[in-house]
Amino acid sequence: MMDAEKVSTDGEAISEGEVGSNGETPPETEVEFIGETAPDTDVEFIGETSPGTDVEPTGESIQETEVESIGEATPGMDVEPIKKTMTELNVESIGEETSETDVDSIRKALRGIDLESITVAYPPKKAKHRKVRPQAEVESTGRAAPEGELEVSDHEKVEALLDELDELSEIVSSPEVSYSDISPLEMGEDDTNVSATSTDTFQQGIYEPIEPIEPTEPPEPAEPPKPAETPEDSTVRAPAHPYQRDFPMGARHRFRLSIMGSLTPSDTDDLPLETDEPPQQESVQSTPRALEETRIQFLDQVQSLSPEALLDRATEGSDEAEEEGSQLIVLDPDHPLMIRFQEALKGYLNRQMDKLKLDVQELDVATKQTRSQRQELGVNLYGVQQHLARLQMQLEKSHDRHSLVACERRRKEEELQCARSVYNKTCQTANEERKKLAALQTEVESLALHLFYMQNIEQDVRDDIQVMKQVVRKTETEKMHAEVEKKKQDLFVDQLTERSHQLEENIALFEAQYLSQAEDTRVLKKAVTEAITEIDTIAVEKKRILQQWTTSLVGMKHRNEAYKTVMDALRECQHQVKSTDSEIEVCKKSIMQEEEKNEKLARLLNRAETEATLVQKMTAQCLSKQEALQTEFNTYQLALQDTEEMLNKGYVEHSAVLSELQATRQAFHQEQELRQKMDMSMVDKLQEQGTSSKMTKYFHQLLRKLQKENTNLVTHLSKIDGDIAQATLDITNTNCKIDMHKKTLAEMDKEVKRFNDLITNSESEIARRTILIERKQSLINFFNKQLEQMVSELGGEEAGPLELEIKRLSKLTEEYNTGVAEAQMTWLRLQQELVQVTHEREEQLVSVDQLKKEVHIMEQKKLRIESKIAHEKKEQKIVSRHMRDLDNDLSKLNMLLDKNRCSSEELEQNNIATETEFLRTLKDSERETIQMQEKLMELSEEKATLLNSFMEAEHQIMLWEKKIQLAKEMRSSVDSETGQTEIRAMKAEIHRMKVRHGQLLKQQEKMIRDMELAVARRETIVVQAEGQSKIDKKVITKTEFHYQQRELQKKVREMHKATDDCTNTISELEETQKFLSSSLQEKQQLLSEMQATTDVLEEEINQLTALKRQNLLEIVTLQTRGKHLQAAIEGKYVFLHRNSRSQLMERKRLSVRLSQLNKVLSSVQEDYPQYQEVLQSIQQKIATKLETPEPS
């Protein structure tokens, strides 16, 4: 019978022609068997396993006594046959579901099932009839009575055994055992004790169909939870979850226990249904008044759970739910805020327990009166056994068919899931390819636009080059024409002497022109000074500076051309005057030299001023860049130090958490071994002292303490696992940050090496060119000496060949001047391009900053979405598990209802007593469906609370992320005003949080008061319901019974619809999860592409800045070189230091400055050793410069 009792906790699906849960059994199968066996058959008691079933975890087997067939097993009444006939399939289904669990968890669960089956089958049933079979009909099965038989004449032995059975029923029927909110796993050991005592009692050969004596015991414990459940209820049920994971049927066992604990009246009320014979009907009609009172009390309890009462409780809980804003927080039972509520609930439960004890005493008196009637029930046992065997065979066949259909359905669902996954993957790849194509198209369009711009710029440059070439050709033709004319004038010198007087007049005219030109020069000087002041005032406006610069350069070009034409005319006049008067030529030469010196000085002044402004701008830019790089370096160094500290902290925390985890695991294993030992010892002691109620209560308390400690250890272990996961996540994040910093450091090292190479190359080039300049300067000095010597030999007059040499040299100087002019034009163009490049660089820097911010935001969103996805997966697993449980329960209910309809035709022939029994079973099934609905609502509320707590935690995480981001922005920001505004915003946020905290404290106090009022309200509702039930004592007719049956069928259909809706929502959540994963991958690809573009842009910016610096240095060197060469050619080069003393002073000043730079570099190396290799080469060059001996 153990298999039947174990399966009764879950197995409620029965086969064709089987008995339903509503108690509608055929007349021949309504006698409960407790201890009697049919002739020539062996009996299975509690603790033994039938060979026909597959239950192996109990570890017990029948040695020499076996059942000849499954159909000859011991039957009971309507619930007991269900338990026996459903043994094989339900145990097989349990074996399928628990294939991944270990034997220990299955053994614990089966112990809980044994307790439930005993509490349902045996303790509540007191004697209606009592009959002892003859000695020939009883056989001993492993643990038989001493003689193996019991005769009718041994009346004293029967009375002693009945007294022991009464004491056992009082133990099992106590509220501590039959309370519906205690899971089977929490009562496993008690179950074994009770089963042991019951087997010892039943082996004596007693037949005890029992009258229900506890219809009033389970009202409060079995009362369905209210829609707005208090936190106390939720916390009481919380520890059952870990067991549900170890054993998938755990949730169902717990639910079944609460249901079957409250269905005890229905199991025994079906007993009179077998009384088709007149003698049995008379015994049913002679039921005492106690039975009628228990039936009325049971109906009152069922009516207290009517839909109207549930709606009233739902409206009361909805008000509290609206105030909390659908954010229920489950408090710990040891929390100080729960003390007041627990005291109120304790007082209420104590009153209920006192009331129940009084009811039990009254019912014990009633059972003693009805004990003499229970012997009559064993007469029809053999026929019932034969009928039960046939029904069991039919049930096994139907279970086999059901398992085959279920396997086929599961296989089809797996194929459908594979097809869906393949389709989703193909859609995702197609979307990715489309997005890549769109990105490539946009990139091609941008490149085409860039190419068009570059072609336009190239065309403009070519046009400028062509214009410059035309100007050069024109000047060359003019020079050739002037040379031809000069040769003609040399041939006609004699004719020019005659025209000397005319030339004197021309000289006077030229002197007047000279005066006018001097005034023009003064005007030009004023204009130059005004231009300088305008350049200083318009330094901020870069565009206007470039425009005025180009116009001033064009004006200078025109003035230089006019000056060259005037100089050519003057030279011609001087040659004419030389032939007439040498003194006039000497004066003219001195005048011309002074004029040239004046003009050159003016040009040198202008160029020097422009160069000074350029140098100042470049130095300011270099200083700003240096400061920016210094700040960036400091920020990177601080970030690196922070990451290293965080990594060390993470390693320390990880090691600490691992040690704690190891210690808790060892403690858990020790506690588990200790618990097993205590279980075995308690089983042995309880088998020896089965009738001692005090010992059983003591062991109940010990078991509850051990179970509480076990649940606490499991919760602590789960918390430690979560901490370890969080620590590993932090470690991975810090490792990623360290890798990123290492990469940036390597890139910066590469850039420093590249800049060092450029500096060394430029220095070598400067040294080479200085050597060439010195050589050319020596050649120029040598030629000047030769020229002076030749002029002195000729007496101060120049001959024809010398004039030709001078012309050649003047041509060379003009060519150099044209080259300088071209270099100036190219320099202007480069300056314009530089301005454009700087604008583009600033725009790109702004875009890069924006992209970095977006990347950071996307990373945060990614982390949040991953956490949401993981949470949704967990919820889906939980919901799918509960949905499977509910589907199984609904399928079993449907089968029971089908059996109910089949048996209703036969029940119409029964009398008024059978109708009342059917009414009880109907109420039991209605209460079972209501409890299932309340269980579903309870699960939804738990899910809502978990979601709310998760949202709160996510909100806190977002707040901390926001604070961290604000701190980083405050550190990196330069503008103090923006930091002050953010600080004020943070203070306002802190103030709002404090106000919210005060509001939450008030709301918490209000909720505690509401909880206390809810306990009082519950008591008043129960009292009112009991009074109303006593007033409204009605006998339900047959039509009302059929109406209630139809209502139940309607509720079952609604439950089916609800399950369909749940499956639809699960599929929708899966689709949203797939969509989110695809979008996340797309955003990651977009982020990688944006990162690649930013890297390319940064490389281009670096190249452009290097090219800009190189061009600026080359332009400056070329300009200074051209100036010095022009002055050397014209013999107007002026040394910076006219004497050796000033030169030595300047050299000392430069050496002091170099020594200061050397000290600065050494201090920088000490402060920042990571840049020691970069600065070492510069310091060595400065040292070599300092070590070179000074020239004497």
Swiss-Prot record:
It comes from Mus musculus (Mouse). GO terms for cellular component: axoneme; cilium; cytoplasm; extracellular region; motile cilium. It comes from the Eukaryota. Residues 308-369, 425-451, 581-649, 733-768, 830-871, 919-972, 1044-1118 form a coiled coil. Residues 1-78, 126-153, 173-196, 211-246, 261-289 are annotated as: Disordered. The modification Phosphoserine is found at S306. The keyword Nucleus does not apply. Belongs to the CCDC40 family. It is found in: Cytoplasm; Cell projection, Cilium. Residues 215-228 have a biased composition (Pro residues). Keywords: Cell projection, Ciliopathy, Cilium, Coiled coil, Cytoplasm, Phosphoprotein, Primary ciliary dyskinesia. Specifically expressed in the embryonic node and midline. Residues 27-45, 267-279 have a biased composition (Acidic residues). It holds the Pfam family BRE1. This is Coiled-coil domain-containing protein 40. Signal peptide: none annotated. Disruption phenotype: Defects are the cause of the lnks phenotype, a phenotype related to primary ciliary dyskinesia (PCD). PCD is characterized by recurrent respiratory infections, situs inversus and ciliary immotility and hydrocephalus. The length of the cilia projecting from the nodal pit cells in mutants is drastically reduced. One of its GO terms (biological process) is lung development.
